[in-house]
From Swiss-Prot:
Spans within the Cytoplasmic topological domain: 367-484, 1089-1135
Organism: Tomato spotted wilt virus (isolate D) (TSWV)
Gene that produces this protein: GP
Name under which the protein is recorded: Envelopment polyprotein
Signal peptide extent: 1-35
Alphabetized UniProt keyword annotations: Disulfide bond, Fusion of virus membrane with host endosomal membrane, Fusion of virus membrane with host membrane, Glycoprotein, Host endoplasmic reticulum, Host Golgi apparatus, Host membrane, Host-virus interaction, Membrane, Signal, Transmembrane, Transmembrane helix, Viral attachment to host cell, Viral penetration into host cytoplasm, Virion, Virus entry into host cell
Record family assignment: Belongs to the tospovirus envelope glycoprotein family.
């Protein structure tokens, strides 16, 4: 009976269970299962349950108290299961809210899962220099977050490399690849915010928004003032900033300074080290950048310490050489005496040194007979020809009193006793170590070691807010009106501003102050503005700013930041502050803001022609063609080269200087931009599974996005069912994936359209000073000379139509690069726009791109292996074209400088013959104009334009008081003349007179008044008016090594002038040949004098000849006529 009752009970329970399951199954067929989102990159899968997170509204209404409503809805929706709505419907957020229902709710009372990461399951997905990208899971829901605080993330997965804190210095992204080398200070995660359907919800510093995540290179941002320094020791400059925190650092272009930014508040002092004064470093502080000028600290210290004493300055500056001379003297006298005295007591030291250096000693002893100065070890001086006695070189140790009859080292006999032993035997070791040559070498090494110890002890040197009327303001970042006593953003308005058609009314809450004023708002602003703060913004800043305020909130207003050094408008300043908040609204505007650079760090050193290092050549002609002298000049097309020509004819008294300087040579490439490619940092996946139906059924809840979509069906069968889903061979899982790109490592791909050889050539001298760009296509021509390029090399391996890559290091790369819209497996995928938006990718993912998993009663998951095309890893196959970084001009062309000759530069100069004749009368100069622009006592100088009319053709010398000129001679033609002249002045030459001396004749001077001088001090960190800087420049100009080198080559100018472009090379060859010739004659003269003195040939001798003796055939004095009958005496004990 008990068994029957038990069976009856089991049957009843089974029937009840089946009935209940049928009811639940019927109910669930009309409901979708919860969706999950999975992010995976590499070995780090991340699973999202987005049934609630995809309902997160945007942050468009945060400025007007809607953040409370948004967070409240977020909590309610995460707890309430509901049907997943279409993405377009989710993005429509009502702006109007009822603030009365929100005032009792505090933001702090609402849960924030991103801030509670320490108590929840979390995982670090990416770490940049200034923030972190992570996910937090709570009740099956995963939230994506980007934060600039590491607090509470220590227990997260992958937190091993997480820093304790991130730097709080403000930064903005760099979009120009050319600027990354100069201003990059690390990376930062940004949120490109937009409301398109391919984006996804994400939280930045607890503020929810919709967008994508992008890793960008960043530069410093902020108001910073750099105080100039006169560079007197200790080379310190001061920086100040009104902001609460600011960053600065010293950076060399291309250097990795990711974690070297120094934060400060208020003011700070920076002392430059000697390495920073090499002319290659820049001081970066906020928006400002300043080039640290090249300064020889050792020289400048000496100039300052021994000012006005040229002898002491010279001794101080050259103290490094004086140190070496002192050590050489110490080694030659006291140290050598000490070593000779301690040779016997320190025999163990020499045995040890001989053992260590035995291979070197063996080689030197065997090759000694081939050395030029081999006899110097015996006390004799010779160059090549003299022979030495073998015993002098090969004497054994003092333990043996006899020398070897024949020196084994120098012997050529094959049956010598020592040849029976190996080179490594003890016999050879004792012989080699104990030769006089080896002992002398070991003593010399000992002396050098002692000298280096002493040398190390010798010192190195001898020596924007918006105001209503009076007290009511709008401050960016605060959604309420505040009073002048503003300290932090309040919870409600502190004042009221009513903008009417004819007047403005202002009132301060809590007081009886009401002020009226005229309506002086910005005109022609047609937009709707209802609240008081909106009306004020429309009135003072305009509708464009109001649109940003309403739709693009500022989470942090940076009220102390004005960005005055960049000259931005109010809208630009607002967008810059949004970038500081980590939000990118528009790539084009971001590119414009990040491309603004305040300071001189990008300024190129426009140096004048370095005449002191250029070769000189004299040209003499007396033939006249069409009334002109024609000079045909050829120069090698090599950057940095040039020649100074001294032009004259047989009748002229003074030569005319004509300088040709090739500033740079390279290839100008015209290109068209194709796309940008970057590595994938991580991947975001969003999918939705259904229990029954197919892909069409799934797409009703998960709409197609247009690219990188996928759908898997069927997904419901036995063994792969979610709870209470019993469908067989039905169901589908559909969704999409989005990549997060590391724009910091992006490459821009260009197609080469055209290549042309160009040269920047500067002409100075009698024609004034001017620089022109000459191409191989069109010859350059003016009234006095013509220039043409004959190229040997055209494009150096870059062919027309080839794809090239401009890398993050500003170098150019070539190789196998994929064409646009070509899915080939070569470098060039993913293909993106500048801001990381895909322009070519897979429309639908294939089966090999992903995998999915399920369980009998668990939820389904999708793993994305490759979201679109990814061939960035093939960049290792690219070849770097040039070692010189390049800059692109408007993404349409670039100049690739070359350091080798590309051909020949041919110049034809036609000078009127009247230039070489004495003028018959004083010329008449009219309509004169001399205007200058530049700085005083600086390397740039004053750039002046001299214009006048002349009634004669002549050559003239020019001068002006207190100024040195780039050229002191001009070729004046009849009629209109225009010259570019650079003047370096110690005083303002305004209203002074420049004097022209026709044909150098001081009796007929012509004066030209300086009409206008505009002084523009360069924005740098050194005061060029410092007397020490002036004295240093004077010292350097007076002690140029290049000037001395040119001076010693000058005797060969006449011969070398016949070799054209090989002028300087021939001078060097002739100088070297002359030096060797002098040494050879000195060697012969020395040998003759020594023999003359040694044999006393200066005494008169008479020889009595004996008739009985046969005639002596050989001379009395012959080599080796006297044979040594005993070994040389040892005097070492006397030393």
């Amino acid at each position: 009976m008990r068994i029957l009752k038990l069976l009856e009970l089991v049957v009843k329970v089974s029937l009840f269970t089946i009935a209940l399951s049928s009811v639940l199954l019927a109910f669930l067929t009309f409901r979708a299962t919860d969706a999950k989102v999975e992010i995976i990159r590499g070995d780090h899968p991340e699973i999202y349950d987005d049934s609630a997170e995809n309902e997160v509204p945007t942050a468009a209404s945060i400025q007007r108290e809607a953040i409370l409503e948004t967070l409240t809805n977020l909590v309610l929706e995460s707890r309430t299961p509901g049907t997943r709505q279409i993405r377009e419907e989710k993005l429509t957020i009502p702006i109007s809210t009822e603030p009365a229902t929100q005032k009792t709710i505090s933001v702090l009372d609402l849960p924030n899962n991103c801030l509670n990461a320490s108590s929840l399951k979390c995982e670090i997905k990416g770490i940049s220099t200034y923030n972190v990208y992570y996910q937090v899971e709570n009740n099956g829901v995963i939230y994506s977050s980007v934060s600039d605080s590491a607090e509470g993330l220590e227990k997260c997965d992958n937190s091993l490399n997480l820093p304790k804190r991130f730097s709080k210095v403000p930064v903005i992204p760099i979009t120009k690849l050319d600027n990354k080398r100069h201003f990059s200070v690390g990376t930062n995660f940004f949120i490109p915010e937009s409301l398109t359907q391919d984006n996804y919800p994400i939280t930045y510093n607890s503020y929810p928004t919709n967008g994508t995540v992008s890793l960008q290179t960043v530069k410093l941002s902020g108001d910073c003032k750099i105080t100039k320094s006169n560079f007197a020791n200790p080379y310190t400059v001061s920086i100040t900033s009104p902001e609460k925190i600011m960053g600065y650092l010293i950076k060399k272009p291309g250097e990795n300074v990711e974690h070297k930014v120094i934060a400060f508040s208020g003011s700070a002092s920076i002392t430059f080290t000697e390495e920073m004064l090499d002319g290659e470093h820049n001081l970066l502080c906020g928006d400002k950048s300043a080039k640290i000028p090249k300064t020889n600290k050792r020289v400048r210290d000496c100039i300052i310490k021994y000012s006005k004493s040229i002898y002491k300055q010279t001794a101080c500056i050259n103290f490094s050489w004086i140190r070496l001379i002192l050590i050489a003297l110490l080694i030659y006298f006291p140290i050598r005496w000490l070593v000779n005295k301690t040779t016997k007591p320190l025999f163990l030291w020499y045995d040890l040194m001989g053992l260590i250096t035995y291979p070197v000693l063996l080689l030197i002893n065997c090759l000694w007979k081939y050395f030029p100065f081999k006899c110097s070890n015996c006390g004799n001086l010779c160059i090549v020809t003299r022979e030495c006695t073998k015993v002098c070189i090969c004497n054994k140790s003092k333990a043996s009193k006899e020398h070897s009859s024949e020196c084994p080292i120098l012997s050529k006999e094959a049956d010598h006793d020592y040849n029976k032993h190996k080179w490594t035997s003890m016999e050879w070791f004792h012989l080699i170590v104990n030769t006089k040559l080896s002992l002398s070498l070991l003593k010399f090494v000992t002396e050098i070691l002692i000298g280096l110890v002493i040398l190390s002890q010798i010192p190195m040197s001898m020596a924007q807010t918006t105001q209503c009327l009076s007290g009511c303001f709008y401050v960016p970042g605060c959604p309420f009106l505040v009073t002048s006593k503003f300290e932090k953003c309040p919870e409600k308005d502190q004042c009221y501003c009513n903008v009417k058609e004819d007047k403005i009314i202002e009132s301060i809450f809590g007081t009886n102050i009401v002020i009226e004023g005229p309506n002086d708002c910005i005109e022609n602003q047609n937009c709707i503005a209802r609240p008081s703060i909106d009306n004020l913004i429309k009135c003072r800043l305009g509708c464009e700013y109001l649109d940003l305020f309403q739709n693009k909130p500022l989470y942090n207003g940076f009220s102390d930041y004005t960005e005055s050094s960049l000259g931005l408008t109010s809208v630009g300043l607002y967008e810059a502050k949004r970038l500081r908040n980590g939000i990118i609204d528009s790539y084009n505007r971001t590119d414009k803001i990040s491309g603004m650079i305040a300071g001189d760090s990008l300024d190129k050193n426009e140096t004048s022609i370095p005449e002191n290092i250029l070769p000189r050549q004299s040209l003499i002609f007396d033939s006249v063609v069409d009334g002109k002298y024609r000079y045909m000049i050829e120069q090698s097309l090599l950057g940095g080269g040039g020649t100074i020509f001294m032009l004259n004819d047989k009748t002229s008294e003074t030569a005319k200087k004509f300088v040709i300087y090739i500033k740079s040579v390279g290839i100008h490439h015209e290109v068209s931009e194709e796309y940008t490619t970057a590595p994938i940092q991580s991947t975001h996946t969003d999918f939705y599974p259904t229990c029954i139906g197919n892909c069409d059924t799934c797409r009703k809840n998960q709409a197609l996005t247009g690219f990188q979509d996928f759908c898997i069906t069927p997904t419901s069968y036995w063994g792969c069912e979610e709870a209470w889903c019993f469908a067989i061979n039905e169901g589908a899982t559909c969704g999409f994936c989005r990549n997060i790109y590391d724009i910091d490592k992006s490459y821009r791909i260009y197609s080469v359209l055209k290549s042309t050889i160009v040269a920047d050539v500067c002409i100075s001298g009698i024609l004034g000073g001017q620089c022109s760009r000459i191409t191989e296509e069109v010859p350059y021509e003016n009234t006095l000379f013509q220039a043409d390029i004959q190229s040997d090399l055209h494009n150096d391996g870059i062919t027309i139509g080839e794809l090239i890559a401009h890398g993050p290091d500003s170098h150019i790369y070539s190789g196998n690069i994929a064409n646009l819209n070509d899915p080939v497996k070569m470098f060039g995928h993913p293909q993106l726009t500048h801001d990381g938006v895909p322009i070519f990718t897979k429309k639908t993912l294939e089966g090999d791109d992903m995998s999915w998993d399920c369980a009998a009663t668990g939820k389904k998951s999708v793993t994305i292996k490759t979201c679109g095309y990814d061939t960035y890893r093939f960049r290792s196959g690219l070849e770097q074209i040039s070692d010189i970084p390049v800059s692109f001009k408007d993404f349409s062309s670039f100049f690739l400088e070359k350091s080798f000759s590309l051909g020949e530069l041919k110049i034809v100069v036609d000078l009127p013959s009247d230039l070489f004749k004495v003028v018959p009368k004083k010329p008449s100069i009219t309509s004169t104009s001399l205007n200058c622009n530049g700085c005083l006592l600086c390397g740039q100088g004053l750039s002046c334009i001299l214009e006048f009319f002349s009634d004669l053709t002549f050559s003239t010398a020019i001068s002006i008081d207190a100024c040195s000129l780039s050229t002191y001679q001009l070729a004046v033609k009849k009629g209109s003349n225009k010259y570019n002249i650079t003047m370096f002045c110690s005083a303002n030459p305004d209203k002074k007179k420049m004097t022209l001396y026709p044909e150098g004749n001081p009796d007929i001077p012509v004066e030209v008044l300086v009409n206008n001088v505009i002084i523009e001090e360069p924005e740098n960190i050194i005061d060029q008016n410092d007397e020490y800087a002036h004295e240093e420049q004077q010292y350097n100009s007076d002690s140029s090594a290049w000037g001395f080198w040119d001076y010693i080559k000058s005797p060969f100018n006449f011969i070398a002038s016949y070799f054209g472009s090989f002028f300087d090379t021939i001078r060097v060859v002739l100088l070297i040949a002359f030096i060797f010739l002098v040494i050879y004659f000195c060697s012969i003269l020395t040998s003759i004098c020594k023999g003359y003195v040694k044999h006393k040939s200066y005494k008169s001798r008479s020889k009595i000849e004996d008739d009985d003796e046969p005639e002596i055939k050989a001379p009395m004095l012959m080599k080796d006529t006297m044979t040594r009958r005993r070994p040389p005496m040892d005097f070492s004990h006397l030393v």
